[in-house]
Amino acid sequence: MKKYYVLITLIVLISLVAACAPTAPTSAPTDAPAAAAPTEVQLTENEQWAKDNGVGPYQPASEDWAAIEAAAKEEGSVCVYSNSSKIEKLIEPWSALYPDIKLDCGDTDGITTKMQAEQEAGNVVGDVWFNSDGHILYGMFMPNQWLWWYTPEGVVVSGVTAERPYAMQRHSIDVWGYNQEINPDGCPLTNWWQLTEAELNGKVFLENPLVDPSTTAKITLIVENADDMAKAYMDLYGKEWTTDEMAGPDAYGVVAENAGFLFLRKLARNHPVLEPGGDEVDEAYASLGMDSAIEPGYGLTGWDSYETTLDGELAMAPCLTMEPVVGIKKNSYVAIANKAPHPNAAKLFIKFALSEEGAKPWTAIGIYPGVDSLPLAEGMPAIGTYKLWESNDAFAWANNSAVRDFFATELLGGE
């Protein structure tokens, strides 16, 4: 028992000693580890070029135009690939402004193919894209960083957004043209569907959409705006387009998915004449002195062809009372080629092309300038006067191939 009390006493004493012992010092709090510096985004080779030259997303808010012009003079020339022969009319005013910088290249066939090949080969010749084919611009060239957008400071171009940054130099309107010499009282047509009727078999003219991507995009718009075409069918015939005898499956089991496809089927089976270019289209139905006893037909053409009529060289006039729309509004873009050999001269050219002087060759009936502040041609109605289909580059890029193949099949005898 005595040993038991001794043990208890020892335990109590040990506990007291432990309680009185000094507390171990608390460690000072350590600072939180410094946040790692953000990793700098690595630019692609093309992005680095764009940054070095101040184009695309790297364009500064303000630029020294005296320095740009001096650098452009050192470059000595600018190669502009244009799909319009009217660019030749810019040579004289350009040379007056910039005698030390040659305006080169000009009207060019196959611009998209040429510039794609140059970019893929790394042998860039063209400095500036001055072309339509927006579906290829946005669908292929922009994702591959082959073309950079550039709008000079202070220039307001309608339709330019963060998603659609390329400047539009002009908006051209395509319409159905008729021969006003044979039809002096006006266009006999009021509805697109009349173009598919037997009376006009072999009498509708257009550029070949099987080889011309711009025309392919135009007929793709018909499919995109199928609801408009359905209403126009009802307005003309008083019944739904689905009741048409050609709406069902063809010999291959292919049906017309909507009223736009039905229109293309009926047009194709009405034997349209596919021409190599716009001049040939106009000559086919609107040449002067055609036999009035023979139906001249109609052509899908630029409204600006009417300028040639005013010059006394053609009998084309636009059908301005057509349903569902009068025409198609298409865009011509300006952009700087990636790794352009003359980037400063390219900037000067775009600034010039977006000016009143640079727009003069295209200040014509049927064309609206891309810069809102520029004047219209005398007699040109304000934009919005007529209903037009707007070009849809994204839809065209996604659907052109399918629409072209459908049209080709119908031309070859889909029945």
Positions of PLM-derived features:
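An extracytoplasmic/periplasmic, membrane-proximal ligand-sensing/linker region
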Residues: G54-Y58, A71, D372-E415
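A ligand-binding cleft/hinge motif common to bilobed small-molecule-binding domains
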Residues: H135-M140, A293-A315
